[in-house]
Amino acid sequence: MGVDPRMLGPASPEVGPSTGAPLEVGELVRWAAHTAIPCQDAAGWRPLRGSAAAGHRAGVAVLADGAGVSADLRPGCEHEVDWFSTALVTAVLDQLAPTDALGPVVGEPVALSDAVAGALDAVRAQHPQCDADAGPWATLVVTRALGDELEYWVLCDSSLVVQFTDGQVLQLLDERLEQVAGGWRAGGPSPTQTMNTPGGWWSARADVRAAGQGLTGSFPLADVRAAWLASDGATRPIELYRTHDAQAWGEAVAQDPWALAHGIRAYEAQREAALREAGTKVHDDIAILRAV
């Protein structure tokens, strides 16, 4: 898979000091992967030209991390990956927590998978001049606090990390992309050949069938101390660097998410040559949104 060359540059700049405090519900840590992509400071919510986007509204949390690939792998669309990620997050929020709602939902609430399908259709309709099936794509994580439950829907390699009231931490991650990538490295089909195909891996692109492919479930809210939606750039310490397991990552983000983000960037800067030699992006977008 081609990699956006902006993602292979020097270390990202500092983006504000550690606050020494946990995130409040709905708060976000977001740090773009490269100096060529303007970053967002700790307090602001202004748009970020990185691939990750996130939002929180009325108990619903959504994070989308667009694939930072070169334009030749998304030839059907004139829009950048960050446009797609932002549009997708907004569309999911509009499906589940519309800003023009006049009161509580009457009847059965829409299922998360149905909301994702509606959001994919809505984003496609926003750029009819493009071939959305050959356009950008993203990972997607959605949670909703509904009644006594925390519902979730997870697709591709962004994560939902839940810290329970007993202190245990669980990471929910769709591992199909990594399984396909492992087969590709062993001589099998490439991820681009197997994306959104039966037996392959799935992403949020334009195919509404992806809505039926997310990992779904729920937890009693009474058992949940905190939950975070996280891009794979934020969970690199678990999957790539092996410096943390899910338990240690959850404890770190609960204590000081900015310190965790700075630690990731410092680790990457120290190992830049080795990461390049391995064909790995030196940096990836960090996005962590607290859902509950």
Where do the PLM segments sit?
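N-terminal entry segment of metal-dependent catalytic domains or homologous docking segments
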Residues: 1-92, 214-218, 233
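Short helix/loop capping segments that flank catalytic or ligand/cofactor-binding pockets
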Residues: 71-72, 162-164, 237-239
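Glycine-rich phosphate-binding loop plus the immediately following alpha-helix
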Residues: 169-204
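A short catalytic or substrate-binding loop motif that flags glycine-/basic-rich loops and adjacent residues
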Residues: 34-39, 132-137, 280-283
